């Protein structure tokens, strides 16, 4: 094999990364660049799309140097990205008409309220699988069209293009030749019919968004175009693309119905592959596209917890109880339990399955005997309790009782958290040897598209489990602990 490597571009909320993988899925080299976060008003979050491109393109150049390889050695590039973040740009000059509006930004709440008043909430859920919320791209696009001078007129003349970050990167990598997205990213816009896999005319009319600005939707594993790194060397295929959480699902090889993964980052994102059926949640979860490849679509149920690792950051930065996130395991293990203390980290409300923006954080069960160790342990347990909430909702929606869950993200290095997650859910927790599963998913999609790997069956033999955590507590204790959590949550709402 003359081409020995795949490069994954992992464009995240705070940094851009590039990782080189070899045929055995081992990491050869990586590069990372952070970029600016902008908060022009309370609740608003923006990025400079040109800075994102500069950071991502520089990591691509740097990672080749670190791996000591040339473009001729690279079979393909795969892309994974922060989802929902919205860019609108001039198709001739390539200049954005406004900063990228980030998925966290809440500025379009009034637009959501207007759409709810028009009675569109149920149609949006049935068509897109999403809740009507500023989180998703559709209302962000509308805000730009309605509020940036001259932009709507230019869009209606066919002068502008829209894209989520995947689309923006492909357009830049191909020097403006390719305007494309994949089903996983399209499914996060609130404009895409996940059943027909088409942009939805009724929603485009309701949002008043011209179809001409939208990208073409192609499979998650396909050759979209070619790029030359820094304008030099041979052309490399851009051949795989998926939103970050779906990419992690694929990187964990959760490719069959009933398989699930939980990513422990700033928040927690739990996705379960539901196969060819788009299961409509009755318990506060999102219905989304898991992957679109091999001529078909697999769907997923998704639940998000707002405060995962961010809860540990709060312990460190606001309370000063720890110096480093890694310290939490040491302190948590110094006590047998939390002494009845529950921390409900509803600092920005509660996500799935509650969707309660007005809930606020609380420490429940404090007594004179409670100490730092109990509070730190309660913070870690809260991450696992919230994931149990999601797992229970998924089991009810899918009628599938999960036996195993694969995990990834920074917090999975915490053995205490992983063991408690297994204990409180009564589910086996599998921690992979390689936890860079988001980037690995993009690499898999690209490699499969160009024949670097023959099939997902081949990939299964390369995916190793570093450790599995099995439930160790009795059902009686599990039920008692979780009942205490549920009672504590009611006090925050």
From Swiss-Prot:
Coiled coil: none annotated. Sn-glycerol 3-phosphate binds at residues 13, 83-84, 135, 244. Keywords: ATP-binding, Glycerol metabolism, Kinase, Nucleotide-binding, Transferase. Its EC number is 2.7.1.30. It is an enzyme of class 2 (transferase). ADP binds at residues 13, 17, 266, 309, 410, 414. It holds the Pfam family FGGY_C. Glycerol binds at residues 83-84, 135, 244-245. GO terms for biological process: glycerol catabolic process; glycerol metabolic process; glycerol-3-phosphate metabolic process. ATP binds at residues 13-15, 266, 309, 313, 410. Belongs to the FGGY kinase family. Key enzyme in the regulation of glycerol uptake and metabolism. Catalyzes the phosphorylation of glycerol to yield sn-glycerol 3-phosphate. PANTHER family: GLYCEROL KINASE (PTHR10196:SF69), SUGAR KINASE (PTHR10196). HAMAP family: Glycerol_kin. This is Glycerol kinase. It comes from Shewanella pealeana (strain ATCC 700345 / ANG-SQ1).
């Amino acid at each position: 094999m003359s081409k020995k490597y795949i490069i994954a571009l992992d464009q995240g909320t705070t940094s851009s990364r590039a990782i080189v993988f070899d045929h055995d899925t081992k990491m050869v080299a990586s590069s990372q660049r952070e970029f600016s976060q902008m908060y022009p008003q309370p609740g608003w979050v923006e990025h400079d799309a040109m800075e994102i491109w500069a950071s991502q393109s520089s990591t691509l150049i740097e990672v080749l140097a670190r791996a000591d390889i040339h473009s001729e050695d690279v079979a393909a590039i795969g892309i994974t990205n922060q989802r929902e973040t919205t860019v609108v740009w001039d198709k001739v000059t390539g200049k954005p008409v406004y900063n990228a509006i980030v998925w966290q930004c809440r500025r379009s709440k009034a637009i959501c309220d207007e759409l709810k008043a028009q009675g569109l909430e149920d149609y949006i859920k049935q068509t897109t699988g999403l809740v009507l919320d500023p989180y998703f791209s559709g209302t962000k696009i509308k805000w730009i069209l309605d509020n940036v001078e001259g932009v709507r007129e230019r869009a209606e003349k066919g002068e502008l293009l829209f894209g989520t970050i995947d689309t923006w990167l492909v357009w830049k990598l191909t020097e403006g030749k390719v305007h494309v997205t994949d089903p996983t990213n399209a499914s996060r816009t609130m404009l895409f019919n996940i059943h027909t896999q088409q942009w939805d005319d009724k929603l485009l009319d309701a949002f008043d968004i011209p179809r001409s600005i939208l990208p073409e939707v192609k499979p998650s594993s396909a050759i979209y175009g070619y790029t030359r790194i820094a304008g030099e060397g041979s052309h490399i295929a851009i051949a795989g693309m998926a939103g970050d959480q779906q990419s992690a699902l694929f990187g964990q090889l959760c490719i069959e119905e009933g398989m699930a993964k939980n990513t422990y980052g700033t928040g927690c994102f739990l996705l379960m592959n539901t196969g060819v059926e788009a299961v409509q949640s009755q318990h506060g979860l999102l219905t989304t596209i898991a992957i679109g490849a091999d001529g078909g679509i697999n769907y997923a149920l998704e639940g998000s917890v707002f405060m995962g690792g961010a809860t540990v950051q709060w312990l460190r930065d606001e309370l000063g109880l720890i110096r480093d996130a890694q310290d939490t395991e040491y302190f948590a293990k110094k006590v047998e339990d939390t002494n009845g203390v529950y921390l409900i980290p509803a600092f920005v409300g509660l996500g799935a399955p509650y969707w309660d923006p007005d809930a606020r954080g609380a420490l429940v069960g404090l007594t004179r005997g409670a100490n730092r160790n109990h509070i730190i342990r309660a913070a870690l347990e809260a991450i696992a309790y919230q994931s149990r909430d999601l797992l229970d909702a998924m089991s009810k929606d899918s009628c599938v009782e999960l036996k195993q869950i694969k995990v990834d993200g920074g917090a999975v290095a915490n053995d205490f958290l992983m063991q408690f997650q297994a204990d409180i859910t009564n589910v086996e927790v599998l921690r992979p040897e390689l936890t860079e599963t988001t980037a690995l998913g993009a690499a898999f999609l690209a490699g499969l598209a160009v024949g670097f790997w023959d099939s997902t069956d081949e990939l299964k033999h390369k995916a190793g489990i570093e450790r599995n955590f099995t439930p160790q507590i009795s059902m009686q204790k599990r039920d008692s602990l979780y009942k205490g959590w549920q009672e504590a949550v009611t006090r925050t709402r």
